[in-house]
């Protein structure tokens, strides 16, 4: 785990760091443009067809060690990530653009926000997608909770390769989104992150079989926060992967928790 101060200090020791930020995460883009004023930056995905598909192209920015306000703002908005690369700003921009272009063959989908924390974690933790982030030796993403960055070492790949997301990868991505959301929610903020991850994975599994409304997602989330022990029972995964309705699962979840509680006090 690394603090923003430590990352910025490493720049003065010669570390070539860049940050990617999604302008579209800002309700008022002028807030971001003011923070990056005078900094060396490039619109990401320049010279790719996807540049025309989004209101504001993400920005690739070279950090200079004096950018704490910018980095802190991006961290708290979960709007991007930090990377280390020995390539020039223009070369790195082109390399990352090639990564996006390779995705044209990815089942017709475009993962233009591969640098957002949940998406980046999904890619970086997947062996099958280890070819991604070509040209970057390290990537830092905001931790689920707290004020530190988590570091991912990158293997060196010289040839672009297609990024293909499977249905299972989509579920993992949903779980990553939920982990970031739950970790800072009032119901989960004082609960160990290992339990938060379990809950997010459980909710993603439930939603993969039958969509959950926002109301029901909140209901399940708050119930799991109050009944953590149910997720460590051997029957839990069998229950949530059962192809029955979520209403039926809800009833059985109550029954399972009662059984777990009885066994605990027996």
Identify the role of each PLM range:
Residues 10-14, 53-54, 74-76, 133-134:
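Flexible, charged surface loops at secondary-structure boundaries
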Residues 21, 63, 84-85, 141-143:
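Surface-exposed beta-strand edges and flanking loops
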């Amino acid at each position: 785990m690394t603090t923003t101060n430590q990352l910025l200090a490493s720049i003065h020791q010669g570390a070539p760091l860049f940050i990617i930020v999604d302008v579209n995460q800002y309700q008022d883009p002028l807030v971001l443009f003011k923070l990056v004023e005078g900094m060396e930056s490039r619109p990401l995905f320049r010279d790719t067809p996807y540049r025309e598909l989004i209101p504001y192209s993400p920005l690739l920015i070279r950090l200079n060690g004096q950018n704490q306000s910018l980095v802190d703002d991006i961290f708290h908005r979960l709007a991007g990530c930090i990377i280390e690369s020995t390539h020039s700003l223009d070369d790195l921009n082109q390399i990352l653009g090639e990564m996006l272009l390779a995705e044209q063959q990815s089942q017709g989908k475009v993962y233009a926000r591969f640098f957002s924390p949940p998406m980046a974690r999904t890619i970086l933790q997947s062996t099958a997608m280890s070819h991604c982030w070509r040209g970057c030796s390290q990537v830092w993403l905001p931790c689920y909770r707290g004020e530190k960055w988590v570091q991912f070492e990158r293997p060196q790949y010289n040839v672009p390769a297609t990024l293909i997301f499977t249905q299972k990868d989509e579920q993992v991505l949903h779980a990553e989104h939920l982990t970031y959301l739950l970790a800072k929610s009032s119901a989960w903020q004082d609960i160990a992150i290992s339990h938060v991850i379990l809950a997010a994975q459980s909710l993603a599994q439930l939603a993969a079989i039958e969509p959950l409304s926002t109301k029901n997602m909140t209901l399940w989330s708050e119930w799991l926060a109050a009944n953590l022990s149910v997720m460590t029972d051997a029957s839990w995964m069998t229950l949530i992967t059962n192809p029955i309705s979520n209403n039926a699962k809800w009833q059985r979840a109550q029954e399972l928790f009662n059984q777990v509680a009885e066994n605990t006090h027996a």
